[in-house]
């Protein structure tokens, strides 16, 4: 891989003997920067640093943005913060929600103890996802939690970071794999075998109840292991970016 953002140029050489060699070269070592473009880029960067570099909050502990052990394997304090913020953001828009879920794979960095800047939050949530509202049944909630923890304790991008949901995963049991979700590489659960939900929104879980969930637009469209979200009876976007909500 040559990385991202056109930072490197990759050269692959295939010899007559079939041997393959690959090298990566930093792009800035191959070309001279155009002064006009470089000056403009520096000015834009200065504006960004001014806007996003100012501290607006403080944390006394590191907020865990690691993949594993972390947001793709277990509950984390950063996952709690983000999903609590989704609930708060929805309520600020006049929505009444029971809980919030975001995929652990969408959390991309740790915030170290100390001052917190907009840049920190944007680095944690870099994809521009927006806050969405869905309504699903308790049975559908069980399905997405079962599907999204199918390989736990191994890491999975869809691992559910939640607010307002108390649930457990019995990792001693295997995943009862059903049919493949259309257009994905994931499989629905044939039965609910590993996940038990205790409460949602502070009330005893009811598989027949309908729950209002705050989530992100990627998941609301069925991303990762959340195929059931795409068929939710109510599904709409509030147009608020997650990083701004947090």
Language-model segments: residues:
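Hard-cation-handling environments
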Residues: 31-116
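Short amphipathic
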Residues: 23-25, 55-62, 133-135
